[in-house]
Amino acid sequence: DVNRSGGVLLLAQMSSRGNLLHPGYTKEVVDNGVAHDGVFGFIGNGSRPAELAALRATVGEGKMIWTPGVNLAVGDGEMGQRYGDPTAAVLSGSDCIIVGSGIHKADDPRAAAAAYAEASWKGLLQRNG
């Protein structure tokens, strides 16, 4: 106990092409992270629902999963990013989607933010049935 508030999100997966994670990386990170109370969650791959679902199955419900790599325009980005559907990410186990360019590069960022909120809420309602 170090008498502090807060916690850590560990990077378990990446959505960008050509990332430097080796094949056993996710398992190592999750094994270490679930054992420590200071770790409240993991960063997962929002562009690959199957990978994200596998992460959720391994992590269980006791830790959060936050996911970048989501965009309403599913596909590849300008710098090697891969984007998946935000609703699919939540259905696959994400607790929180992380959105950057999908909002700040939109013609109407406010409307885009509302669309992402709606998409993630839809996924959460479907997931929790």
Predicted regions and their residues:
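Functionally constrained cores in energy, signaling, and assembly domains
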Residues: 6, 12, 44, 63-66, ...
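Generic secondary-structure signature for well-ordered alpha-helical cores
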Residues: 3, 35-38, 95, 118-126
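A short pocket-lining beta-strand/turn micro-motif at the edge of beta-sheets
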Residues: 61-63, 93-99
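Conserved anion-binding
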Residues: 1-64, 71-75
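Glycine-rich beta-strand-to-loop/alpha-helix junction loops that act as flexible
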Residues: 67-70, 99-102
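Catalytic cores of alpha/beta
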Residues: 54-55, 74-95, 111-116
